[in-house]
Amino acid sequence: LKMAKLYDAISHNKRNSVILIIAFIIIALGLSYFLGYLFENAFVGLIIGILFVIIMTLIGYYSGDSLILSMHHAKEVSKKDDAYLVNTIEGLSIAAGIPTPKIYIIKEDSPNAFATGRDPKHASITVTTGLRNIMDRQELEGVLAHEMSHIKNLDIRYMMLVTILAGVIVLVSDFILRSFLWGGARSHDRKGGAGVILILIGITLAILTPIVAQLIKFAASRQREYLADASGAMLTRNPQGLADALKKIRDAKDKV
């Protein structure tokens, strides 16, 4: 029964994710349209917005993980480097029924781990040396199972797309606000009260939309973390391992 409820929650989350991504795309294009309107060519603004969303999404979808790993100077791990880490991830992959992700490590004292990629066939799990050094075997297995669940549940793809689209919304909103500094809205002064009201509505949306988008993103991310905890516990059959690991991570960060 618990397993069925978990699968139902994951399916429900995936449906909500699709709706949220579509909503973010519509918002980004709507803001682009309004930006074009300020410069008296709403259609061009919409076309530019569509191209911008497509380009940024493609870059993030196909290169986002490599950019993140490169930014953190992550090094790929082999069995020769850390046999237990590799063997544990291979075992969890079999239990989850997905291909074994690539494994990376970052020389960083702060205990952390994350999964990246666009799908289970193109995924990786990264841990810091700080995490590797303070975790015992059960705790490490719990953390890795949590990250494996993010891969299996396609959280990695969703969060990458949402992060990109939220970034696009922030950028377009910033362009809208800056356009008034550049004088882009001056030509609408002659359009009377209706034009002024529309511009005020647009400015309000440009200010509030990025904030709302980030809040929605954080709320959705938190829900996915809960589901990854539950899915990870199902993989290891040992929820205490992850609970102890999270306590260690929290204590380590409190000391910083």
Question: Where are the regions that the model predicts?
Answer:
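S-adenosyl-L-methionine-dependent methyltransferase catalytic core, i.e., the SAM/SAH-binding region
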Residues: 205
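Polar-ligand-bearing catalytic/cofactor-coordination segments
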Residues: 1-29, 37-38, 43-47, 51-198, ...
